[in-house]
UniProtKB/Swiss-Prot annotation:
Gene3D superfamilies (UniProt xref): EF-hand (1.10.238.10)
Complex formation: Interacts with PCSK6 (immature form including the propeptide); probably involved in the maturation and the secretion of PCSK6.
Species, as recorded: Bos taurus (Bovine)
Descriptive protein name: Reticulocalbin-3
Gene: RCN3
GO CC aspect terms: endoplasmic reticulum; endoplasmic reticulum lumen
Family: Belongs to the CREC family.
Residues that hold Ca(2+) 5 according to the record: 254, 256, 258, 260, 265
Glycosylated residues (UniProt): 140, 262
EF-hand domain boundaries: 75-112, 113-148, 163-198, 200-235, 241-276, 277-312
Its biological purpose: Probable molecular chaperone assisting protein biosynthesis and transport in the endoplasmic reticulum. Required for the proper biosynthesis and transport of pulmonary surfactant-associated protein A/SP-A, pulmonary surfactant-associated protein D/SP-D and the lipid transporter ABCA3. By regulating both the proper expression and the degradation through the endoplasmic reticulum-associated protein degradation pathway of these proteins plays a crucial role in pulmonary surfactant homeostasis. Has an anti-fibrotic activity by negatively regulating the secretion of type I and type III collagens.
Amino acid sequence: MMWPPSLLLLLLLLRRGAQGKPSPDAGPHGQGRVHHAAPLSEAPHDDAHGNFQYDHEAFLGREVAKEFDQLTPEESQARLGRIVDRMDRAGDGDGWVSLAELRSWIAHTQQRHIRDSVSAAWNTYDTDRDGRVGWEELRNATYGHYEPGEEFHDVEDAETYKKMLARDERRFRVADQDGDSMATREELTAFLHPEEFPHMRDIVIAETLEDLDRNKDGYVQVEEYIADLYTAEPGEEEPAWVQTEREQFRDFRDLNKDGKLNGSEVGHWVLPPAQDQPLVEANHLLHESDTDKDGRLSKAEILGNWNMFVGSQATNYGEDLTRHHDEL
């Protein structure tokens, strides 16, 4: 589950006429606060019964997998061969596909949705088309242009908008690692998807604390935690799941058992340590395809097990090789 969008994106919804202040969480019971890496595939990992859909989607991406059945087996194998060449060229170019090169390819594939969302944002924010996104451009494209001292004079709840603007600017400054007030594509990616970047971890934690710490003591108390998940209606009996969340707070969130969450504990909650899914899948594909057991894959070994990596009209393939190389 992805980290909730920046408040600037919520503001876009507000300005389009949405009623009321939106919750900073997406998903049931506030679980949108927690960033889990998206699964490589929703399909079962069922190689034992000849179902390689999971591997196809992990190797090529879920959306790409929808295109697989358009190709003949011959076309599929030919295009897989081209992917193999590209994987090796992206690495050391020694004619073999190493575990690291295979992992890098799978990770790159799984990040495509992020690259696509950043490309769309880039087209919106780079208003002067100079190949960079300045803070002024992003601010004006998102909030509208205001003269100094007149910010949000024409909207209701101007103070809330000002806080949102300040919060977005703070996040932008952290993402802007060289401090020139101009975001490169990588820096804009960090701004829009901070959960993907180690140097943005502290800002994700700070924003979560600001959202939940109602008494401003620097901690998240259990009642503040629950208030983010559930608002009781007059006379309403508290649902059983709320008590379960209290137990979750006590048993798993509050690591030092002092009855509250500090910044480190908030970070452990919203940005939990993640399994390296691309590495797990790369190891699996290597194990299943490395016939001479030398710890690397030749092109012949991959093509010899081609139906695990990709498919054909009977299974799948995708648009990876119908896209321009710089899109992949």
